[in-house]
Amino acid sequence: MAAEPKAAVEVVKVDLFEDDDEFEEFEINEDWLEKEEVKEVSLQWEDDWDDDDVSDDFSRQLKKELENASEKK
């Protein structure tokens, strides 16, 4: 059998920084920074965010498991 010629393999170079061209650079506008006020962040949950309903099945089961684990120690 005759040796078959190898197909030319084309190596594609990937430019890792090619995507950087898609974003436009903006200068920092100091007037905009001065006008922006720091707004007080409202609480997203109560300070005591624990589940108020301790009578649900999960709470009872968890409490039972914790008691069993502490007894085994």
UniProtKB/Swiss-Prot annotation:
Species annotation: Arabidopsis thaliana (Mouse-ear cress)
- Give the protein family: Belongs to the DSS1/SEM1 family.
Which GO terms of the cellular component aspect does the record hold?
proteasome regulatory particle, lid subcomplex
Q: Top-down, what is the taxonomic lineage of the species of origin?
A: Eukaryota, Viridiplantae, Streptophyta, Embryophyta, Tracheophyta
Q: What is this protein called?
A: Protein DSS1 HOMOLOG ON CHROMOSOME V
Q: Does the keyword section mention Ribonucleoprotein?
A: no
Q: Which Pfam families match?
A: DSS1_SEM1
Keyword set, alphabetical order: Proteasome
Q: What's a BP term from Gene Ontology annotated to this protein?
A: proteasome assembly
Q: What does this protein do?
A: Subunit of the 26S proteasome which plays a role in ubiquitin-dependent proteolysis. Also associates with the TREX-2 complex that is required for transcription-coupled mRNA export.
Q: List the coiled-coil residues.
A: none
What InterPro entries is this protein classified in? DSS1_SEM1 (IPR007834)
The gene designation is DSS1(V)
Its quaternary organisation is: Part of the 26S proteasome. Interacts with BRCA2B. Interacts with EER5. Interacts with UCH1 and UCH2.
